Amino acid sequence: MKKTRTYLLRGILATAVLLLIAFGIALSNARVELTEHGAHQRLLVPIGIGMAGLNTFAGTGDQVHIPGFLDGPVVRRKADGSWAATWFCENKVQQLTGSGTDLAIDCAGKRHVFPVARTPMVADAVFDTPADTLILSDIEGNAHFLDAALASLAVTDAQGNWNYGDRHLVIAGDAVDRGRDVFAVLWRLYTLSLQARDAGGAVHLLLGNHEQYLLRGNTSRANRDHLYALTRMGGQLDVFGPDTLIGHWLCLQPVIIKSGRTVITHGGVNPVVADAGFTVNNLNSAMRRYWSGDMPTKAELDAVIGPAGLTQYRGYLEDGEERFARATEDQIDEVLAHFGAKSIVVGHTLVERVTALHEGRVWAIDVNSNTARPEALLIRNGEPAAVPTGVARQLDEKGGRRLTRPFSLFVASDLAMLKDLVMSNYALSRIPQPY
């Protein structure tokens, strides 16, 4: 028996050694994939006749320089009204402290001004229908599209300021991730929220699954250039922490609103959520309690952040297999009856144009693709209709120009990159699922 055990242990050890040797040989022929600006994307390891791509989410890079790119600012305000700001400009982090109402940043020859003295009040989640409510979804860090679409639709003026009077703008989730300009999008909406309030209007930023990923430290969908900048500024969890202006503001945003007789949420309302009796205010309260560390009940968590909850549900358009069944006409009627609504607006699931489904009881508005018709949803005097934005999304669906270079086991920076790759994937695996 002892000999058998000894042979078995030797066999296991020999196999492990052979695997390590094979992995070392593979690494000696590996390549590092980078963005065109030098941020690390993947480690390409030869496997057989192909290459296996190991994603890195560590925010590392080789002499990264991103022309004209401003990321941030991350602003923390003190009790005495002063503030401290950190931002990334092209290839380095800069900092400033001050006490004024605005923060002015000069980056790559362009001036950017941010309001830092006030936090926008969160608009009521249940409100009477304004004359006009314009709804967009799934901006996903595409600041160029957002700015151009809002100008085209006369929501903003030529200087990018609020021009929509007492009307309402709704972003139905997923303003962040994928695109590089996440901070630019959030600061634009933050600023417009202040200006809209002053004019008697409102901006509603609903949380989608990607805002939830961001606030929980899930970097798996982050643009790598943006992730590099985030890492230089302290990492995603720190940069969007509740002690920052943008992080605190995001944690206050709703997951569902009701405008007159129209419910708006990112993914949709699972019939199970309606059956549980949750109101709009119940659901938003549960989400805010979660961010503050006051853990909601399991039923509340399933409703607001679960795999079949408000931000992940796709049941009005497709079958979610184990997670949820496709909603029946009767179930949609029951959801609407529960909220006293006649229609529900959802993003999250791609469509080729802003589409009325289920005889107009559901409006699907996620047109975030290059092939979809450039449209938004306008609810005028309670009646929804698709309107052209006049602006294409212009998505870089291939992820930009990618570069590769050899990986070396004998270069300290490459070994550090490998360690950081492993640790970043380990950190992602440690994020509790589903919540």
Task: Locate the predicted segments by residue.
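Feature recognizes metal-dependent phosphohydrolase scaffolds
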Residues: 2-435
